[in-house]
C-alpha cells in the first residue's frame, strides 16, 4: 500500500497531528491506541463513564484567579512541531512570573506505566511551542486518591515522550491494529472484547 501513496499523501501522514490522548493510549496498550484512533472503536464501561463525568465537571468551570494563579480550563492546543493536538484539562499560570503548568485530571490512581506522565509532558511540549517559554513541570490529579502528583519534565521524560509520539505516528500511519497482548491491564479496558 505504501508504494501506491503519492508524495503529498506521504507528507500528510508525516504531518498528521496526533491526539494527546493517543500517547497515553499507546503507552497503556498499542492495540487500544489503534482501535480508538485508527478504527474509531469505542465502548463504555464504568471506568470510562467515571472518567467522562470527571472531565465534564472539570471542563464546566470558568477561568478564575486565586492566590496569584490563573486557572484556565479546557485549553485547546494544536502544534505542528512536534505534531500534537488536543485539549488540556487545566493550565495554571502564575500571575507574577507567567510560568505555565498543565494539570491533567485522571479518574483512577497513579499507575505503574508511564502513560499519564507521557501525556502530561506532551501537553507541556505543546505549551512550549505555542508560547515560546519553557514549561518545566506539570501535575496529575487523581480522583480515586484525591491526590495531586507533581511531574518534572526531565530530559529523560521528554525523550520518552518524543519516542512514544514517533511510535504512535508510525502505528497510526500503518493503519494496522496489533493483535491482543493479554495481561492484567485488560481487565480495566473497555475494548478488551473487540
Residue ranges, per PLM feature:
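Non-catalytic, well-ordered alpha-helical scaffold segments
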Residues: 17-21, 85, 117-121, 184-187
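A general structural signal for short secondary-structure boundary/capping elements
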Residues: 70, 148-150, 183-188
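Iron-sulfur (Fe-S) cluster-binding segments and ferredoxin-like electron-carrier domains
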Residues: 38-39, 192-194
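Nucleic-acid nuclease catalytic cores
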Residues: 80-86, 93-172, 193
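Immediate flanking context of iron-sulfur cluster ligation sites
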Residues: 20, 167-188
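Metal-dependent nuclease catalytic cores that hydrolyze phosphodiester bonds in DNA/RNA
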Residues: 1-102
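Extracellular/secretory pathway and lumenal proteins
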Residues: 33, 190-193
